[in-house]
Amino acid sequence: MEQYWGYHTMLDCRACDIESIKNHDNIYNFAKSLVNAIDMKAFGEPQIVHFGEGNKAGFTLVQLIETSNICAHFCNDTGDAYIDVFSCKPYDRDVVRDEIIKFFKPRQITVNYIERQA
């Protein structure tokens, strides 16, 4: 099997539980739990900041990991979430999906996955 430089999972999560995506502590706990669940090493604390206006407003999460990053944006109005996991260390995409379901309860998840190699 060819070894790739990186693995990138992009999850578009429709109609999450609104209260869960507007809750700073829930997003923080998600970041901590996901890092552990996919056996990564966090580099510092997650950065979670509320950004945007109108239908773009919501929390943005950035969690640096030793092998790259976990990023997410949560939309207050729709309950949608856009979550990316990028790492040069392989991880289980199903575990990522399970963690999202546990913390945000989306009605639907569309998963796109690419293996990165320059």
Where are each of the predicted segments found?
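Polybasic/polar functional segments that serve as interface/processing modules
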Residues: M1-A118
